[in-house]
Amino acid sequence: MKDEKVYNGKKIKTDKEITNNKEISSDKDMVNNIEDRLWALRNEMDKHNMDMYIVPTCDFHGSEYMGDYFKAREFISGFTGSAGIAVVTKDQALLWTDGRYFVQAADQLPPVYKLMKQGEPDTPTVLEFVRNFANEKDKCIIGFDGKCMSSSLAEKIEKISNVTIVSKYDLIGKIWNNRPDLSCENIWILNEKYAGKSFGDKIKDVRLEMEEKKVDMLLITTLEDVSWLLNLRGNDIKCTPVFLGFIAVTGSQTALYVQRNALSQQVACYLEKNNIDIREYNDIYQDVKSIRKRRIWIDSSTANYQITKLVSKENYLYKAMLPTTKMKAVKNETEIANMKKAHILDGIAMTKFVYWLKNNVGKEKMDEISLGEKLEYFRGMAESYVEPSFEPIVGYNDHGAIVHYSATKETNYQIENKGMVLIDSGGHYLEGTTDITRTISLGKVTDKMRQMYTLVLKGHLHLGNAVFKKGCSGVALDILARKPLWDNGLDFNHGTGHGVGYLLSVHEPPNAIRYRILENQELNPTLKPGMITS
């Protein structure tokens, strides 16, 4: 017998039937589940007199990709893309996402949700929507989980005159009965022959930056920065070899807040040898609360609101991009040499795959999912291969137009010896990270396919062959890729290129190639030698 609760006279399911996606057998089941989840969430909102509850795509560290424990927005909306914010009021459910996911979101969201196409002229931003919503009320109470909300967005909402924020409740956690556990996988050491620079040398550079900015403490909250600084890697996020942790750096101390069960004796000894104080993962909040009369450097765009909220007003918060973010974006000579090796290894795997595909399509059964698995098989032949750098995007014919498409059993196309298949994939090697997209003709193609392929190829070649002046940013170069399309009244609704981490996130700020200038000027940097951009 299923557990049931009643909200406004309606029975709602609360057991694993509505919380475990493995139990979902059809699109109809998903719709019913999402509706039940919204009823349950609104019931929790009523208990705290909330007019609105915001569920961003976020973990405790502002990560782009995250572990299953943190997929609250997916749980409450059914949308599985990597970017988006769900907003739930007493009578509305809305989801904002960017142009990469318009097609996917329209397909996955149940009718009860309204898709808000982020960046479109007639679509308000989340902040604008919240402000307009609040202005219609004398007093507006807005809730969210402060540990899973960026400080920058939360502080903007907080400044709306008639808004009261309630950030201490994880309401999704209240209704997610079979929520996956917080990941706690083994942490491992990245040898200096791959990292190119020791922790000791990196921390010296960090402290020099701290002295220049006249700060007493640096709080590192992003997982990629934590891993990069320590020359450690982990397995807490699929396809991103990082681990859950925070770092606090002062002029004389470095403290790592981490789940101790993730530390082997070897890693613990490594940390001790480097004079790194090991503290419990969740102690960061109490320790931050106890700081007094210090200048603290923090990146409010990635640090969670709960951390910045706990910082006493006796302190001064210096809010800027972390020095580690800028440092790791510019690869050292060892990293560059290794990355070249990684791309050779990846090129070999891709060549073997394309050869196999061309020689076997139409002869043996294959589909979108099996193509991704086959490419993974060829990558796995390299001794230094670690894992995919993201879930492979294999889109046959019209599926190739869905920017971050992920094949499922329900959508999985059979591959035939005609048309085109787009494959966007990458790998993590000890020598670095790759990201490669290829569109492959499998036989007869239409004139339209041929035209689109040619225009995209022209843009790709123009950008790849670009010679540009020192001081250029990605915004200045973006037109080279788009011009052949623009000349024909066409475009693509997403960025052109992005930074790539070294055995870290395949999407690495701040360097990128896009036509939009971002509000945060630190994310519109000058391109520098050593920045690897895909």
Residue ranges and their predicted role:
Residues K2-S534:
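Active-site neighborhoods and metal-handling regions in enzymes and metal-associated proteins
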